[in-house]
């Protein structure tokens, strides 16, 4: 495991031995990261977040933060990310809400470009492309190959 000395990894986080974590990245206690994933510098991964294998997060992504929903009151909700996804600079991915299924999900082999946002309770299939600054409001569902 290649972890930069300035990265902050909670001892309760579960990272595969092949995960790479860049400078000043933060990984919280309830995070699981699968084999071959790369967490770039200044990326923050928190919340109840599960990241599959071979995912790449470019600098300044915010992953697994609380949903931007006025009804959210700190309930334990989740973010689940499949395998082989690429998240470019400054992407934000929020957890779900109890008013819906309680989980935000992204499938496999998605390409999420810079400054895109995937809000609470979104269900994104596999092989999707979200262009720069694309924003999915809460509860949006995208099928595969969108």
Task: Name what the model sees in each region.
Residues 2-146:
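Structural signal for interior beta-strand "rungs" in well-ordered beta-sheet cores
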């Amino acid at each position: 495991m290649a972890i930069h000395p300035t990265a902050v990894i909670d001892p309760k986080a579960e990272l595969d031995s092949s995960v790479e974590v860049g400078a000043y990245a933060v990984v919280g206690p309830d995070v699981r990261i699968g084999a071959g994933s790369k967490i770039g510098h200044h990326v923050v991964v928190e919340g109840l977040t599960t990241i599959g294998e071979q995912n790449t997060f470019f600098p300044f992504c915010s992953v697994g933060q609380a949903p931007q929903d006025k009804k959210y009151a700190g309930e334990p909700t989740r973010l689940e990310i499949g395998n082989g996804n690429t998240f470019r600079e400054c992407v934000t991915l929020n957890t779900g809400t109890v008013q819906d299924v309680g989980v935000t999900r992204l499938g496999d082999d998605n390409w999420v470009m810079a400054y895109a946002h995937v809000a609470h309770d979104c269900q994104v299939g596999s092989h999707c492309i979200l262009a720069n600054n694309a924003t999915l409001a809460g509860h949006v569902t995208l099928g595969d190959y969108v």
